Amino acid sequence: MRKKILFFAMTLLLLTGITASADVLGEQNGGWSTYMGAFTYFHNVQFNSDSVGKQNEYYVEYTPNEDAVPIVVNGASIWGTRNIKQAEQYMQENGLRPLAGINADYFSFKTGIPMGYTIADGEIISKEYGGQDAVGFRSDGTGFIKWLDIQTTVTDGEKSIDVMYINKWCQAGFDPVYLLTDKFGKTTKTQSECIFVICTPNEGRLHVDETMSLTVDDVFIYNGEIEIPEGKVVLLMDTSGVSEYYDFLSRLH
């Protein structure tokens, strides 16, 4: 009989404020604006100062509306470096017309994995450990900045352990438990001996403030990367990690 376990994600949000920065660009002496459609404008403002000379400021002005909505795009997988032109092509191939784009997060130049949180339509695409300031958008297109801290656990019976990272790179010598989905990529990219727990989602979703029920399909140890089956969830950790976590995963047969 395959074992069933529960995965729970809880979010902690705190409102934070933004203070206006000092005017250090100098005296404004020119600029232009271009209407891009869907209540969106592209602005250029030119400044000049005695200390640094001529400077240009570029920004997009967006009025929330139903024709243009902010989205997060990282291509077909979390793993992999891509430039903004590749992101634009990915959107066009999926029936979307981009108006403007910016880097949404710091990311690894080696892996392309964002260093913070990525959430789309409530689904946890990628999760970091600990809290961070986050930029979000409501369904009506309006934006906000809040402190975001998602705490995730996996439970088997009366015992639970923390899952610190979701769709992040599990590297050799790191202690915590990771959770990977097929959104991470085709393989786990692991380069050391790890314990892997392959699970099938039953009920619930990998969403903020929700519980997801999983059925354990297989538990094994392997040195290197493995394929991530489509639709499956993989729990894993380096075998040299925290013994309490290792014992928990190994008992999920």
Where are these regions (language model features)?
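Gly/Ser/Thr/Pro-rich low-complexity, intrinsically disordered segments
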Residues: 21-253
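Sec-dependent N-terminal signal peptides of Gram-positive bacterial secreted proteins and lipoproteins
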Residues: 4-22
